[in-house]
UniProtKB/Swiss-Prot annotation:
Sequence-specific endonuclease that cleaves unmethylated GATC sequences. It is involved in DNA mismatch repair. This is DNA mismatch repair protein MutH. The gene is mutH. Its main location: cytoplasm. One of its GO terms (molecular function) is endonuclease activity. It comes from Yersinia enterocolitica serotype O:8 / biotype 1B (strain NCTC 13174 / 8081).
Length: 228
């Protein structure tokens, strides 16, 4: 397997990043982990982000989970997406942590969600549970930016969810809110609380929340680009 020296320097442009991602297509996670000298976990229960970290290593990402994009110098976010044998997404896609305080004056145009989704390198990975992690293959990459219709759907959901947060209704929001974007708790344990605004404007402690893309958004997007 000849990929390149590891870990590579951050990519200098979109074309170089896409070429690197294309070079990984068809390899199993076991092959990539072995080449990188990484231990492969038995499953992803305790280390959900492992696949993304492995691919970031190969692609030369720098941001980790900081607010900027994974490839901040060229303005691109990496999103791995587990897919079924039919090419359909198997789970929702984490976008970023939701701000629960200090939101006066925030707009869709200046939001982290819009920033993170402005330009995305999607890398599908086999995700069906009966396939052992080491045997799951990496799929063909896709460079994507939301079209007008997609951006409008995202903006509408984001504004509705942020209105509820600002009005002190964060604890009334369920995963069913939003057509394509949902807000739900993001915490490894229920003791990791963060400050938010309550219904009467008072500070409250609640679970951190994250924005996630629903499968009803990523499914049609993948189908359109890969002609499924």
């Amino acid at each position: 397997m000849s990929v390149y020296s590891l870990p590579p320097a951050p990519p200098t442009d979109e074309h170089q990043l896409f070429q690197r991602a294309e070079a990984l297509s068809g390899f199993t996670l076991g092959e990539l982990a072995s080449k990188a000298g990484w231990n492969i976990p038995a499953d992803l229960k305790r280390i959900k982000g492992w696949v993304g970290m492995l691919l970031e290593f190969y692609l030369g990402a720098s941001a980790g989970s900081k607010p900027e994009q994974d490839f901040a110098d060229i303005g691109i976010e990496l999103k791995t997406i587990p897919i079924s044998a039919q090419g359909k997404p198997l789970e929702t896609t984490f976008v970023c942590v939701a701000p629960l305080t200090g939101n006066s004056g925030i707009t869709w145009e200046s939001s982290h969600v819009r920033h993170k989704l402005a330009r995305v390198l999607w890398v599908p990975v086999e995700g069906e549970r009966q396939i052992p992690l080491a045997q799951r293959r990496v799929g063909a990459p896709l460079l994507w930016s939301p079209n007008e219709e997609e951006e409008e759907l995202l903006r509408r959901d984001w504004e509705e969810l942020m209105d509820l947060i600002v009005l002190g209704k964060v604890e009334t929001i369920t995963a069913r809110h939003g057509e394509v974007l949902q807000l739900r708790p993001k915490a490894a344990n229920s003791r990791a609380l963060t400050e938010a605004i309550g219904e009467h404007g008072q500070p409250i402690m609640t679970l951190p929340r994250g924005f996630y893309l629903k499968k009803t958004f990523t499914g049609p997007m993948l189908a359109r680009h890969f002609l499924l």
